[in-house]
């Protein structure tokens, strides 16, 4: 695909942006009493209210045209059929197969029925989880397992950790699940202080069983185990792996039956639905893990079959393109008004930025427009006392997604009503703002003098007309959490398709790994560093001096 800027719909949107320059969202609501009803749609347990956007019917029609002209319909068919849409690695992209309906028996990719492999892995996971929870799996001293430490990084860490945290109300008694990712020794040291080697199982997640951070932490965990009473022959009772490199995992000390597969057609940031999600299944049980998969599948089917005009991922994805490419928005904020979802922005940050942080088109040419935005955010209402000031009065346009359940798992007094009120008030305030006249009258009503009114009122002006979406669900459940994450996966795919980039490789990450290994070797040796830049040389010298 060539640059999307050459598409007819893109050029029409460029003209339309000028038409919309002086249009306020308030005026759009005033002109259409049914706007809220028209700009609300539902799928997989979620309701999307996108009425508070700088968009009218013409905007949305042009955005739909853009998606179609960019080939989104064929791209969706390609992904769901197993086509090699990851062109730089010549791979299928089949995270959707990990949560396919049980009614679907086959999905052939390169001569292999991948659904058979997925179902076999789920049964393997189920047996593992059952043994842990019923006490059949025992440690080397015969005691029941009480703790599981998951060791991974990136998609092998963020997704499972975020989902396990989001499903806190569904956690099973008896086993606590902990997560380790950072190669900073403080991370694993802190977790090991919480557990007993006799009753702890480690799950090591690494496709190659060679990821630097993960393998370093796995070795540290094994060393700790061996120095606290365990023997090498006991390692198989306390270590399992999710990896495609069975030999390396066996050499580490694991039993082959406790090594779970990974596949090339699943990228790390899309892998929580696979055996990478084993820590989630241990935390909440396989019944809830299946519900998680089912919720994601419901969103998959919505995305695959629903007309673009009513399609949640398409609507959210194209609106994002509208702001990034036609309003110069450089970031996008996710603000969940649910304590258990507080870490979700970090997962979506990886999902989106690793997928769409690209500057090369599928055909090898350089892009001619902005691609992936910076994704950030945090829990409401905490953010209101931190960064919301910039959202309301800052100079940069930041589209916002508010995510909130209608009911809480912990109904205490008026807490949830207050939480919900804050969420709605923030979206409303972003839209309506405060005029100079309103600020002046507010000050007069408070008894301010004319001089004070003149001096202070300009500082209280809030321009408004800042866009936001609101996502509602009845309650955060395994199914709705699954659907929510799948929604953002598909939203990311929509945008990548429109921009004409590959959302499923990550060559920038790979470069960092290579250079990291090179620098490490220089830190621990007396190699000649004269070919390096002066800054890197000085930093290496500082490290060596500190270690002397």
Swiss-Prot record:
Record-level Gene Ontology MF annotations: carbohydrate derivative binding; glucose-6-phosphate isomerase activity; monosaccharide binding
Record-linked Pfam families: PGI
Transmembrane segments: none
GO biological process: gluconeogenesis; glucose 6-phosphate metabolic process; glycolytic process
Annotated source species: Marinomonas sp. (strain MWYL1)
Annotated catalytic residues: 354, 385, 513
Pathway assignment: Carbohydrate biosynthesis; gluconeogenesis; Carbohydrate degradation; glycolysis; D-glyceraldehyde 3-phosphate and glycerone phosphate from D-glucose: step 2/4
Protein name as catalogued: Glucose-6-phosphate isomerase
Catalytic reactions on record: alpha-D-glucose 6-phosphate = beta-D-fructose 6-phosphate
NCBIfam families assigned to the protein according to its UniProt record, in alphabetical order: PRK00179.1 (NF001211)
Function: Catalyzes the reversible isomerization of glucose-6-phosphate to fructose-6-phosphate.
InterPro entries: G6P_Isomerase, G6P_Isomerase_C, Phosphoglucose_isomerase_CS, SIS_dom_sf, SIS_PGI_1, SIS_PGI_2
Matching SUPFAM superfamilies: SIS domain
Record's keyword terms, sorted: Cytoplasm, Gluconeogenesis, Glycolysis, Isomerase
GO cellular component: cytosol
Cellular localisation: Cytoplasm
Keyword Ribonucleoprotein recorded: no
Similarity comment: family membership: Belongs to the GPI family.
Assigned EC number: 5.3.1.9
């Amino acid at each position: 695909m060539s640059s999307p800027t050459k598409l007819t719909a893109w050029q029409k949107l460029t003209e339309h942006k000028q038409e919309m320059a002086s249009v306020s969202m308030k005026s759009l609501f005033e002109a259409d009493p049914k706007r809220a009803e028209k700009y609300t749609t539902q799928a997989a347990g979620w309701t999307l209210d996108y009425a508070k956007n700088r968009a009218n019917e013409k905007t949305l029609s042009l955005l739909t045209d853009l998606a179609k002209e960019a080939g989104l319909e064929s791209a969706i068919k390609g992904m769901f059929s197993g086509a090699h849409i990851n062109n730089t690695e010549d791979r299928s992209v089949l995270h959707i197969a990990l949560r396919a309906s049980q009614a679907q028996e086959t999905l052939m990719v390169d001569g292999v029925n991948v659904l058979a492999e997925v179902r076999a892995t789920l049964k393997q996971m189920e047996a593992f989880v059952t043994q842990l929870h019923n006490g059949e799996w025992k440690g080397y001293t015969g005691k029941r397992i009480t703790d599981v430490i998951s060791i991974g990084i990136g998609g092998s860490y963020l997704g499972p950790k975020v989902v396990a945290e989001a499903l806190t109300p569904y956690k099973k008694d008896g086993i606590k699940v902990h997560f380790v990712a950072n190669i900073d020794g403080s991370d694993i040291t802190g977790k090991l202080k919480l557990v007993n080697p006799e009753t702890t199982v480690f799950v090591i997640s690494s496709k190659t069983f060679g990821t630097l951070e993960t393998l370093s932490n796995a070795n540290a965990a094994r060393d700790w185990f061996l120095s606290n009473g365990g023997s090498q022959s006991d390692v198989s009772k306390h270590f399992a792996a999710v990896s495609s490199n069975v030999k390396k995992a066996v050499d580490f000390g694991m039993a082959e039956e406790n090594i779970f597969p990974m596949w090339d057609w699943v990228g790390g940031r899309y892998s929580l639905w696979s055996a990478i999600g084993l820590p989630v299944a241990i935390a909440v049980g396989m019944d809830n893990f299946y519900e998680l998969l089912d919720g994601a599948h419901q969103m998959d089917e919505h995305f695959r079959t629903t007309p673009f005009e009513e399609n949640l991922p398409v609507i959210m994805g194209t609106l994002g393109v509208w702001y990034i490419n036609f309003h110069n928005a450089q970031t996008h904020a996710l603000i969940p008004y649910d304590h258990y979802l507080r870490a979700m922005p970090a997962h979506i940050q990886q999902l989106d930025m690793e997928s769409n942080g690209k500057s090369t088109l599928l055909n090898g040419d350089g892009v001619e427009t902005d691609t992936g935005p910076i994704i950030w955010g945090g829990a409401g209402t905490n953010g209101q006392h931190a960064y919301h000031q910039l959202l309301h009065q800052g100079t940069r346009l930041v589209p916002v997604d508010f995510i909130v359940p209608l009911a809480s798992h912990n109904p205490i007094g008026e807490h949830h009503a207050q939480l919900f009120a804050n969420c709605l008030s923030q979206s409303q305030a972003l839209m309506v703002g405060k005029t100079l006249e309103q600020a002046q009258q507010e000050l007069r009503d408070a008894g301010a003098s004319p001089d004070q009114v003149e001096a202070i009122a300009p500082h209280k002006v809030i321009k408004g007309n800042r866009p936001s979406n609101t996502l509602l669900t009845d309650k955060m459940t395994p199914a709705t959490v699954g659907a929510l994450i799948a929604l953002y996966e598909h939203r990311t795919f929509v945008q990548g398709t429109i921009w004409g980039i590959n959302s499923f490789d990550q060559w920038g990450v790979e470069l960092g790994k290579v250079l990291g290994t090179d620098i490490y070797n220089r830190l621990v040796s007396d190699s000649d560093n004269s070919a390096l830049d002066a800054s890197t040389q000085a930093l290496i010298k500082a490290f060596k001096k500190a270690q002397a």
